[in-house]
Amino acid sequence: NLGGMAFHPETLAVFGMLADKDVAGVVERVKGRVDRWFVATLPGPRGIMAGALARILADQGICVETCFDSPADAYRAARKWAGENDRIVAFGSFLTVAGVLHAIDDERKRHTT
């Protein structure tokens, strides 16, 4: 529940979904709580291309920051954009979250070696 969390100046979303899911329904639930959208293409035949996902968001009055080829790329861009107290949320599919977790793990490995 994003609304119940402590204050953050901005909420950045790393977002990717599969074509057989209710994209509009998911977006409707969170659109007032996200300030910037970083949209990612998901792999496989069920993955929605980032451009198509951005059009669905635009139909709901949401401006997408940029489209990316993968959740990891979207996350890295969100990290560059985010301020010190901002939060980044990854959602839409387990594939989105897995891609972001992989990028976080890669960051940690680079910083510890």
Predicted regions and their residues:
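Nucleotide phosphate-binding/pyrophosphate-handling subdomain across enzymes
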Residues: 1-36
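Active-site catalytic pocket residues across diverse enzymes, especially alpha/beta-hydrolases
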Residues: 2, 6, 57, 82, ...
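S-adenosylmethionine-dependent methyltransferases
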Residues: 111-113
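C-terminal helical cap/extension that packs against the catalytic core
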Residues: 24-87
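Residue-level preference for the first positions of well-ordered beta-strands
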Residues: 10-12, 87-90
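Short, active-site-adjacent cap segments at secondary-structure transitions
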Residues: 96-98
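Active-site-proximal loop/hinge segments that shape catalytic or ion-binding/gating pockets
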Residues: 93
